């Protein structure tokens, strides 16, 4: 698929894709994913062609931007590494997020509280989000999916080939997808204009690591306060001693 020059993959974006290990696919290859294989490494890992990843990502962004009401788009991730990315994507583009377990019947059973009638769904993994894809097929909802080389592609209309198991890879794909959607909508004036949002915002963060970081920062702040108090106490002691010496000298 040939893209207009404005949609060409830039060197910076290619470096981001490689740094996030987006190009590292599975050892097994599903028959429909064979066109996306760039080569196979000696250790058996198949390498994804990032050029084709970018082409599919731009195609998906153009489909998303063509829907007038952003709330008619549902972004789904039952995979833990993709839940933060889905929430951030929805916050920036106006889509409806489903982060965590997908409630069966959300697209087919109008009695349930979680019932939705989207015009498009985007899933992080066709395997973990299989229930959402299956229900979408019942009611003719188009599906965009982040697919690894061994992912099933049944009922998937647009597959974005990438590493959909790594937390950095998942976060980066959702980040780039959100950025391209905003550019197509005109929220970002020009493709040369950098987006103020960093890719790190879309990356999964372990709650235990966050708590540990906060505890370390709190402990560091407490230590600094104690050191400052000790310095003040020492200065006061020196001032008192100097005053006593001065008083004795005057009295003498």
Curated annotation (Swiss-Prot):
Q: Which residues are annotated with the PTM N-acetylserine?
A: 2
What biological function has been recorded for the protein in this entry? Required for the assembly and/or stability of the 40S ribosomal subunit. Required for the processing of the 20S rRNA-precursor to mature 18S rRNA in a late step of the maturation of 40S ribosomal subunits.
An example Gene Ontology biological process:
translation
Question: Which terms are listed as keywords in the entry?
Answer: Acetylation, Cytoplasm, Ribonucleoprotein, Ribosomal protein
Looking up CDD domains in the UniProt record yields: RPS2
- Entry keyword annotation includes Ribonucleoprotein: yes
The protein's predominant localisation is cytoplasm
Q: What is this protein called?
A: Small ribosomal subunit protein uS2
Q: Where is this region: Disordered?
A: 213-252
SUPFAM superfamilies per the record?
Answer: Ribosomal protein S2 (SSF52313)
Family (UniProt) = Belongs to the universal ribosomal protein uS2 family.
Annotated Acidic residues bias? 223-252
| Localization terms from the record | Cytoplasm
Query: What gene codes for this chain?
Result: RPS0
Taxonomy, top ranks, is: Eukaryota, Fungi, Dikarya, Ascomycota, Saccharomycotina
Q: Where are the transmembrane segments?
A: none
Q: Name one Pfam family in it.
A: Ribosomal_S2
Give the source's domain of life in one word. Answer: Eukaryota
């Amino acid at each position: 698929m040939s893209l207009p020059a404005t949609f060409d993959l830039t060197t910076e974006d290619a470096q981001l894709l490689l740094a996030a290990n987006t190009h590292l696919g599975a050892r097994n290859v599903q028959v429909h994913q064979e066109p996306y294989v760039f080569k196979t490494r000696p250790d058996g890992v198949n390498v994804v062609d990032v050029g084709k990843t970018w082409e599919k990502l731009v195609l998906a962004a153009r489909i998303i931007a063509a829907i007038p009401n952003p709330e008619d788009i549902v972004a789904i991730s039952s995979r833990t590494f993709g839940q933060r990315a889905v929430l951030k994507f929805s916050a920036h583009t106006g889509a409806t997020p489903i982060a965590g377990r997908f409630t069966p019947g959300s697209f087919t059973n109008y009695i349930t509280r979680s019932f939705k009638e989207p015009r498009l769904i985007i899933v992080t993994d066709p395997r973990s989000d299989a229930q959402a894809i299956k229900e979408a097929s019942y009611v003719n909802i188009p599906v965009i999916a982040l697919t690894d080389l061994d992912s099933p592609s049944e009922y998937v209309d647009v597959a974005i080939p990438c590493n959909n198991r790594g937390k950095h890879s998942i976060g980066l794909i959702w980040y780039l997808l959100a950025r391209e959607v905003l550019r197509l909508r005109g929220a970002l004036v020009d493709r040369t204009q950098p987006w103020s949002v960093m890719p790190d915002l879309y990356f999964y963060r372990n709650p235990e690591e966050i708590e540990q970081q906060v505890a370390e920062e709190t402990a560091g702040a407490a230590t600094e306060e104690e050191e400052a108090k000790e310095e003040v106490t020492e200065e006061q002691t020196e001032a008192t001693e100097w005053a006593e010496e001065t008083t004795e000298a005057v009295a003498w």
